[in-house]
């Protein structure tokens, strides 16, 4: 459900925990005037930065800094907002937070009433929730605030910035408007069956549906790119012991993350690292070596192989690593076939043949899609990076990509499915207009869930609870 008591005035430290040059305490609510005078010692001119002391209950300065007052509705939350920009010490900011709560509860000298009744510390995400409730942001923009804060790459940050500026929402709203127009035509045909004019034929309903579906496909493609920037791709390195999985992880990461020795079975557990390729995060997992029929040499290796298979089952892609120097060995080749047969269906597998620098000249020819590289020298690594991006569906230089989440993709895909059924109904000679109208309504509602127009309260509460306090 929605966060509770969203009419109460709220206060929180808006900057990250820890020491810094500047820290901010933010207050949002109605009627902040008496609180402002108590803490700042004077009224503040709206939307101007005022330098001066922040006062305790005895009128002594706690600190000096900037105070800014934003009257409603011209603020982040759409309510009246006060921001106190002080020095960024954790103890100092807690003092200012406590002072705001204390001053709010004390009676105003003129009215005798509390200066700001009900002021409380904000819940996580409550400032942004109020911005959503007061129509300052739609839901996709509100989520983009959190994604911008959490962005781990420049590309993700820029895409989140586009979503915050409304790039995603505008495209969704355009689709919704076109669906509304078509729904009106269908409803008119249902409501006035005696009219000689066929509203659907006159308005080219089938053509409209096709054009809406085409536009939706374009938005979905951009959303998939944005989701990739946010979520990344989980890639598992798999193969027999001592084929160079840890060396490849180190080469891709550009750092010595995993222990590398000539001894087979050095890696006994998963080692994970997030790397970036052209701004796309890849979560690469190095796993313990696999053996034919899980023929472990000891209990530790058996557990390690179990975890390796578990990681493979959760992967978006598997780099199945082979050792070129051992190709042709009967025991090695038999184990390769056993492992390959046990790889789960539906997982993308890249066949990568390592140790090209040490392989004998004239080594066996590889399959057309297989890659040949050397984790030690770096030969073939750029080709592997490009293949991983292709596998992820990333298109270099994509324009207008906005950040997107899994729920956005699900909503867009649901919309597409309803449009497919709507087009099938519209193409029938005996089209059931009531069924067509229902499919259009469901498509319309699915789109509305992205921006928050038709979103259950439970989902809203879950979204905003994931924000940091003060945002």
From Swiss-Prot:
SUPFAM superfamilies: P-loop containing nucleoside triphosphate hydrolases, TrmE connector domain. GO terms for molecular function: GTP binding; GTPase activity; metal ion binding. Its cofactor is K(+). (6S)-5-formyl-5,6,7,8-tetrahydrofolate binds at residues 26, 83, 136, 471. One of its GO terms (cellular component) is cytosol. Residues 232-393 form the TrmE-type G domain. GO terms for biological process: tRNA methylation; tRNA wobble uridine modification. The keyword Hydrolase applies. Mg(2+) binds at residues 246, 267. Pfam families: MMR_HSR1, MnmE_helical, TrmE_N. K(+) binds at residues 242, 261, 263, 266. It is found in: Cytoplasm. Its main location: cytoplasm. Its EC number is 3.6.-.-. InterPro entries: G_TrmE, GTP-bd, GTP-bd_TrmE_N, GTPase_MnmE, MnmE_dom2, MnmE_helical, P-loop_NTPase, Small_GTP-bd. Keywords: Cytoplasm, GTP-binding, Hydrolase, Magnesium, Metal-binding, Nucleotide-binding, Potassium, tRNA processing. Exhibits a very high intrinsic GTPase hydrolysis rate. Involved in the addition of a carboxymethylaminomethyl (cmnm) group at the wobble position (U34) of certain tRNAs, forming tRNA-cmnm(5)s(2)U34. Homodimer. Heterotetramer of two MnmE and two MnmG subunits. Belongs to the TRAFAC class TrmE-Era-EngA-EngB-Septin-like GTPase superfamily. TrmE GTPase family. This is tRNA modification GTPase MnmE. It comes from Methylibium petroleiphilum (strain ATCC BAA-1232 / LMG 22953 / PM1).
């Amino acid at each position: 459900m929605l966060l509770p008591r969203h009419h109460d005035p709220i206060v929180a430290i808006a900057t990250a925990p820890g020491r810094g040059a500047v820290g901010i305490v933010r207050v949002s609510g109605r009627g902040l005037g008496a609180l402002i005078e108590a803490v700042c010692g004077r009224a503040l001119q709206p939307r101007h930065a005022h330098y001066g002391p922040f006062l305790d209950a005895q009128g002594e300065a706690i600190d000096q800094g900037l105070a800014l007052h934003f009257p409603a509705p011209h603020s982040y939350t759409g309510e009246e907002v006060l921001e106190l920009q002080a020095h960024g010490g954790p103890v100092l900011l807690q003092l200012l937070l406590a002072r705001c709560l204390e001053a709010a509860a004390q009676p105003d000298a003129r009215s005798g009433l509390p200066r700001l009744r009900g002021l409380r510390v904000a819940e996580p995400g409550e400032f942004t929730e109020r911005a959503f409730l007061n129509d300052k942001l739609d839901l996709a923009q509100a989520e983009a605030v959190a994604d911008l804060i959490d962005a781990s790459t420049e590309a993700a940050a820029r895409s989140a910035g586009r979503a915050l500026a409304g790039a995603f929402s505008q495209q969704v709203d355009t689709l919704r408007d076109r669906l509304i127009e078509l729904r009106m035509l269908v409803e008119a045909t249902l409501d006035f069956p005696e009219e000689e004019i066929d509203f659907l034929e006159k308005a080219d309903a089938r053509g409209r549906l096709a054009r809406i579906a085409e536009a939706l496909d374009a938005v979905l493609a951009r959303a998939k790119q944005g989701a990739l920037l946010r979520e990344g791709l989980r890639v598992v390195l798999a193969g027999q012991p001592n084929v160079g999985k840890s060396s490849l992880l180190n080469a891709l990461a550009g750092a010595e993350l995993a222990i590398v020795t000539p001894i087979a079975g050095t890696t006994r557990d998963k080692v994970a690292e997030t790397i970036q390729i052209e701004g796309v995060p890849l979560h690469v997992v190095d796993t313990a070596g696999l053996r034919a029929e899980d023929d472990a040499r000891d209990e530790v290796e058996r557990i390690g192989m179990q975890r390796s298979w578990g990681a493979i089952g959760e992967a978006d892609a598997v780099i199945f690593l082979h050792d070129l120097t051992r190709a042709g060995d009967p025991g090695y080749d038999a184990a390769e076939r056993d492992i390959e047969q046990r790889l789960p269906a539906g997982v993308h597998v890249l066949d990568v043949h390592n140790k090209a620098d040490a392989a004998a000249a004239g080594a066996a020819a590889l399959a057309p899609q297989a890659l040949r590289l050397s984790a030690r020298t770096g030969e073939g690594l750029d080709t592997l990076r490009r293949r991983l991006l292709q596998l992820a569906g990333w298109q270099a230089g994509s324009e207008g990509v906005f950040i997107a989440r899994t729920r956005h993709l699900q909503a867009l895909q649901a919309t597409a499915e309803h449009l497919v059924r709507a087009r099938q109904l519209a193409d029938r000679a005996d089209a059931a207009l009531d069924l067509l109208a229902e499919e259009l309504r469901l498509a319309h509602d699915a789109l509305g869930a992205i921006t928050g127009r038709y979103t259950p309260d439970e989902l809203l509460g879950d979204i905003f609870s994931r924000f940091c306090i003060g945002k």
